[in-house]
Amino acid sequence: MRVRYKPWAEDYLKDHPELVDMDGQHAGEMTEWFDKTQPIHIEIGSGMGQFITTLAAQNPHINYISMEREKSIVYKVLDKVKEMGLTNLKIICNDAIELNEYFKNGEVSRIYLNFSDPWPKNRHAKRRLTYHTFLALYQQILNDEGDLHFKTDNRGLFAYSLESMSQFGMYFTKINLNLHQEDDGSNILTEYEKKFSDKGSRIYRMEAKFHSQK
């Protein structure tokens, strides 16, 4: 997705340090950042925030972190958080490779990866969010019962991710090869998901854990 640069976005985000971490000021203090101590769920690559703000509104007993590196998108998440009055959702404007700088070992209960960039060229495989380098970070910050939820419309990325997770030592608790055909009504659509499902694109989904967590 091509993002149009918003020169004012950075200053806007910096005006709300209580909601947005721009430079690691809350690194290692994620639990303390919230008003209440509750389980923490993360969405990496939140886009415009429809998915995670909906989750936060539906589940006030869970604390949510939206992690998105594009400042020119993050402001839309911030707008939603303010408009909805969400006190259980914070935003990190940074790259996922910095996860272990922000979260303590075992601090996170769930990670969501929704419609991540597939990076289709083999030479870019290391950038995929299901590459083993990222899986190692997820394993580090997830607690013993923690899991990973993954959705994509890209069949190649889904197949790659299944293989990558299996090789890393993960097991799958749920796999959907056509989510919207099998959906029980609990699925929350992202902006991207709605756009492509309306065109008839198949959506793939999985839930996974690390074997060491059994």
Curated annotation (Swiss-Prot):
One of its GO terms (molecular function) is tRNA (guanine(46)-N7)-methyltransferase activity. S-adenosyl-L-methionine binds at residues 43, 68, 95, 117. The keyword Transferase applies. Pfam families: Methyltransf_4 (PF02390). Transmembrane segments: none annotated. InterPro entries: SAM-dependent_MTases_sf, tRNA_(Gua-N-7)_MeTrfase_Trmb, tRNA_methyltr_TrmB_bact. It comes from the Bacteria. Its EC number is 2.1.1.33. The keyword Transferase applies. Keywords: Methyltransferase, S-adenosyl-L-methionine, Transferase, tRNA processing. Pathway: tRNA modification; N(7)-methylguanine-tRNA biosynthesis. The active site is at residue 117. PANTHER family: 3-DEOXY-D-MANNO-OCTULOSONIC-ACID TRANSFERASE/TRNA GUANINE-N 7 - -METHYLTRANSFERASE (PTHR23417), PENTACOTRIPEPTIDE-REPEAT REGION OF PRORP DOMAIN-CONTAINING PROTEIN (PTHR23417:SF14). Belongs to the class I-like SAM-binding methyltransferase superfamily. TrmB family. This is tRNA (guanine-N(7)-)-methyltransferase. It comes from Staphylococcus aureus (strain MRSA252).
